[in-house]
């Protein structure tokens, strides 16, 4: 089998999900991850600086929406590099997070926490 045929065969058998245009989707007027869990932004993150300030212990309660290897910025979605070297998705320049206390899709119990966490609305 030549290389071209091998590449074509791999493309045919690769799940389309890895080619998704965006890391999030809209559900009930808010952004969610692929499991339907609500996404949040943090007021203390500076829009567009390519950095998350939610690290260490904070990140245990507010896990970052991490990008898979090979993830690429697209439209309103960009990537930021975290202090630990991981790559995190951002929307309109703001890093995206989940909230550990949300237990099922549609929960949005993190909205307004400490007046600095907010549900992301496109």
Regions found by a protein language model. Name each.
Residues 1-2:
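N-terminal secretory signal peptides that target proteins for export/translocation
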Residues 7-17:
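Bacterial N-terminal signal peptides
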Residues 19-122:
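Compact beta-sheet-dominated domain cores in extracellular/mature segments
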């Amino acid at each position: 089998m030549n290389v071209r045929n091998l590449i074509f065969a791999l493309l045919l058998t690769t799940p389309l999900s890895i080619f998704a245009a965006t890391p999030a989707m809209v559900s009930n007027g808010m952004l969610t991850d692929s499991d339907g869990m609500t996404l949040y932004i943090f007021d203390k993150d500076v829009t567009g600086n390519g950095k998350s300030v939610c690290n260490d212990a904070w990140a245990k309660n507010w896990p970052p929406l991490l990008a898979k290897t090979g993830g690429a910025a697209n439209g309103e979605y960009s990537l930021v590099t975290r202090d630990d070297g991981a790559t995190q998705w951002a929307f309109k320049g703001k890093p995206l997070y989940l909230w550990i206390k949300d237990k099922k899709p549609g929960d949005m119990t993190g909205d307004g926490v400490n007046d600095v966490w907010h549900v992301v609305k496109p």
